[in-house]
From Swiss-Prot:
Pathway(s) of this molecule: Lipid metabolism; phospholipid metabolism
Gene3D superfamilies attached to this UniProt entry: Isopropylmalate Dehydrogenase
The protein's enzyme class: transferase
GO terms for biological process, alphabetical: fatty acid biosynthetic process; phospholipid biosynthetic process
GO cellular component: cytoplasm
Subunit structure: Homodimer. Probably interacts with PlsY.
Keyword terms, alphabetized: Cytoplasm, Lipid biosynthesis, Lipid metabolism, Phospholipid biosynthesis, Phospholipid metabolism, Transferase
GO molecular function: phosphate:acyl-[acyl carrier protein] acyltransferase activity
Classification of source organism: Bacteria, Pseudomonadati, Pseudomonadota, Alphaproteobacteria, Rhodobacterales
Protein's recorded name: Phosphate acyltransferase
Family that this chain belongs to: Belongs to the PlsX family.
Database matches in InterPro entries: FA_synthesis, Phospholipid_synth_PlsX-like
Function as written in the Swiss-Prot or TrEMBL entry: Catalyzes the reversible formation of acyl-phosphate (acyl-PO(4)) from acyl-[acyl-carrier-protein] (acyl-ACP). This enzyme utilizes acyl-ACP as fatty acyl donor, but not acyl-CoA.
Record localization: Cytoplasm
Length: 368
């Protein structure tokens, strides 16, 4: 029961996003609600929605703001959170995740969005989209709320692969700088390498080797290398791009999200303790709402797979409608900016002194 035929991503003058409706913990209802939320903020966006048509069809039909903007692609099977990536690589055809990535591969959509199993999504993305020339190990980049003027830092890798040698980390620096340059409109991003301390003698041998490579590539990569970073620098002003391996980055990301929720819970308990506290909460309601919005991890939901022949945004599996809308909003911004083409150009020119493509349509991230 597709509402209409989705436009081709290439040459149609419209932004088309491919969405896996079935992979999240909250089911397709949260995904469809997220699509609707993002659609209202992005009137030029259209969607190819992949999943069980019997489930998602009625949900989409009930939403007037999605009429004429969605095409449903029936996919009878679902990749679960317990499925192994190796199994999905061999037997994933027919799943909503596979179908979602296939739309990007076929040129029907510019960016894919999924709340599904991270390992499986990376595996499917790698075998269907393939890596960009010269990329050894793709990475997942996320936006981290920070004290910088733009409000965000970029951190990668946050979970694509637990391993990363010195050459991988140096390539992450190039990709992260390109993302910050085009996604955050930073002409010369500041890049740092996450370590257990800022002193030169600290850290594993591969980090010291990576530091030499990242520093040597700074001029060609059009970024400024600021040296080693500590965990406290992740939300700070010292850098714009934090480079690390996927294990460390994922632990840091989940710790940050848990801390944000803990602070929110503490504030709720403190202002609900007694009558005076509740009166104070009423007086400070506007400020509290602004604070809650700023530290709400749902509003910066969405990790970007870098280094592939296509753009994929990974939403948290537990994302609600707000989180899904944020991830789709990020996908729309990346599609509108032509980010994939610019990243490919940056990597292709990494051995030369070339620059990214002009930033003629790049918008800084905004919260949805």
């Amino acid at each position: 029961m597709a509402s209409d035929t989705a436009p081709q991503a290439t040459g149609a003058g419209r932004i088309v996003i491919s969405v896996d409706a079935m992979g999240g913990d909250r089911g397709p209802a949260a995904v469809v609600a997220g699509i609707a939320g993002s659609a209202s903020a992005n009137p030029g966006a259209y969607f190819i929605v992949h999943g069980d048509e019997a489930q998602i069809g009625p949900m989409i039909a009930k939403r007037k703001d999605l009429r004429g903007r969605c095409e449903i692609r029936h996919a009878p099977r679902v990749v679960t959170m317990s499925d192994k990536p190796s199994q999905v690589m061999r037997h994933g055809e027919g799943t909503s995740m596979w179908s979602c990535i296939e739309s990007v591969r076929a040129g029907e959509a510019t960016v894919a969005v999924s709340c599904g199993n991270t390992g499986a999504l990376m595996a499917v993305s790698m075998i269907r989209l393939r890596k960009l020339p010269g990329v050894n190990r793709p990475a997942i980049a996320c936006l981290w709320p920070s004290r910088n003027p733009g409000g965000f830092n970029v951190m990668l890798d946050v979970g694509a692969d637990i391993k990363a040698d010195a050459e991988d980390l140096a390539q992450f620096a190039l990709m992260g700088a390109s993302y910050a340059r085009n996604g955050l409109s930073l002409e010369r991003p500041r890049v740092g390498l996450l370590n257990v301390g800022t002193e030169e003698h600290k850290g594993r041998a591969e980090l010291k080797s990576a530091q030499d490579l990242i520093s040597a590539n700074a001029e060609a990569g059009a970024y400024e290398y600021v040296g080693f970073l500590e965990g406290g620098d992740i939300p700070g002003r010292r850098c714009d791009v934090i480079v690390t391996d996927g294990f460390t980055g994922n632990v840091a990301l989940k710790t940050g999200e848990g801390t944000a929720k803990l602070i929110s819970d503490f504030l709720r308990d403190a202002f609900g303790a007694n009558v005076l506290s509740k009166m104070a909460a009423v007086l400070a309601l506007g400020s509290l709402k602004r604070l809650q919005k700023r530290i709400d991890p749902r509003r910066v939901n969405g990790g970007v797979f870098l280094g592939l022949n296509g753009t994929v945004v990974k939403s948290h599996g537990s994302a609600d409608a707000t989180g899904v809308a944020a991830a789709i909003g990020l996908a729309v911004r990346l599609a509108r900016s032509g980010f994939h083409e610019r990243l490919a150009a940056r990597l292709a020119s990494a051995g030369r002194a070339g620059q990214d493509a002009p930033q003629d349509e790049v918008a800084a991230p905004r919260q949805i």
